[in-house]
Amino acid sequence: MTKLIIHLVSDSSVQTAKYAANSALAQFTSIKPKLYHWPMIRNLELLNEVLSKIESKHGIVLYTIADQELRKTLTKFCYELKIPCISIIGKIIKEMSVFSDIEIEKEQNFNYKFDKTYFDTLNAIDYAIRHDDGQMLNELPEADIILIGPSRTSKTPTSVFLAYNGLKAANIPYVYNCPFPDFIEKDIDQLVVGLVINPNRLIEIREARLNLLQINENKSYTDFNIIQKECLEVRKICEQRNWPVIDVSTRSIEETAALIMRIYYNRKNKYNK
């Protein structure tokens, strides 16, 4: 494995640089990365501390810094060390300015923008928490997305991830031999997505959960036949109603959420034509 040092430098949380780095690293199977996070770098004193670390640990520098003087100092320093220094959004900002014929604003304001997007995200997170695991079904019409699936198919973390992207997601568990909420018999506008998983994989996850909780008596929870029937029934429910189904057996939460968002926005764009 080839070791690669990456410095993530930001005047905010470094999440943008981190996502960009991880997306790029996903293209390489033979690289073992070491990421150094340098958030909230907003003055020269803090930047100089980072520069000394970069000097002692040479590697690629990815940055998102708004202040022009700080950017110049960082890029000049890296140029002299002959190491790559890449602005994650610099090219995007420049192209936006050129295309819109609007100059980039010189004044920097580090106060977070409490705009509509921010409050929509807070509301979506609150909604996901209150409508987890089949709670408050009477408020399902407020959801953007409804997830259904057997227990431990990542419905809750996927709902929260969707919420961080501003989408209100409710989730409802399917339990073998238990009546499913009657909302499935109604015509609903929300996107409903079924989550299923390989039964053997789900057994592993559920057994780990029971061991963590020190529970040894719930045999039906890890019974292969019951788990298989739960997944088959979820598929059947979704197929009868033309609802999409996603197999999460080998998918990360981020990947599952991304697929759901693609379906959601494709559907939304279709209706908005």
Swiss-Prot record:
Sites where the protein binds ADP: G149, P150, S151, R152, T153, S154, K155, T156
InterPro entries given in the database record: Kinase-pyrophosphorylase, P-loop_NTPase, PPDK_reg
Record GO terms (molecular function): ADP binding; ATP binding; phosphotransferase activity, phosphate group as acceptor; protein serine/threonine kinase activity
Catalytic activity as recorded in UniProt: N(tele)-phospho-L-histidyl/L-threonyl-[pyruvate, phosphate dikinase] + ADP = N(tele)-phospho-L-histidyl/O-phospho-L-threonyl-[pyruvate, phosphate dikinase] + AMP + H(+); N(tele)-phospho-L-histidyl/O-phospho-L-threonyl-[pyruvate, phosphate dikinase] + phosphate + H(+) = N(tele)-phospho-L-histidyl/L-threonyl-[pyruvate, phosphate dikinase] + diphosphate
EC number(s) on file: 2.7.11.32, 2.7.4.27
Highest taxon of source: Bacteria
EC class (word): transferase
Keywords annotated in UniProt: Kinase, Nucleotide-binding, Serine/threonine-protein kinase, Transferase
Task performed by this protein: Bifunctional serine/threonine kinase and phosphorylase involved in the regulation of the pyruvate, phosphate dikinase (PPDK) by catalyzing its phosphorylation/dephosphorylation.
UniProt cross-references to HAMAP family, sorted A to Z: PDRP
Family statement: Belongs to the pyruvate, phosphate/water dikinase regulatory protein family. PDRP subfamily.
UniProt protein name: Putative pyruvate, phosphate dikinase regulatory protein
Species this protein is from: Rickettsia canadensis (strain McKiel)
